[in-house]
């Protein structure tokens, strides 16, 4: 009798271990994190600055002496300061600004997944809610001082 009980106990323990294995099937719908469209997600502009400066390859833009970014969730603006060297063509500056805005938009989309990333045709949706003020200087001379409000188009095209 004791042998039967021990055998039955071992069998039940074995069955309970076998039934507790993980499932390796495909879920019918992926689990997605969602947030309400009106929920405020604060943007970390210091992180955007770090990401953008890291991604802007100095070899691609050797004419840029310095680049700094900051921003404010209160004003919904990104502030960009860039200093360039002498004799930079307008075309080169346009390419730089285009790439810079794409990098800013993509960095913002990483922080708030409701923003779409930039494509070849657009800068994504980050600049629909966030504006940008950029100042390009050459020494003491201001080359460009432009404010683009949220939703407005940029004054340069590639």
Indicate where each model-derived feature is located.
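C-terminal motif of bacterial Sec signal peptides marking the signal peptidase cleavage site
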Residues: 16-19
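Polar/charged, Gly/Pro-rich intrinsically disordered segments
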Residues: 113-158
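Mature extracytoplasmic domains of secretory-pathway proteins
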Residues: 71-123
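Bacterial N-terminal signal peptides that target proteins for export
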Residues: 1-7
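N-proximal, solvent-exposed amphipathic alpha-helical segments enriched in charged/polar residues
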Residues: 24-70
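Sec-dependent N-terminal signal peptides
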Residues: 7-13
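Sterically constrained small-residue positions within well-ordered secondary structures
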Residues: 11, 60, 71, 123-127
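Envelope-exposed proteins and targeting segments
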Residues: 65, 76-78, 128-132
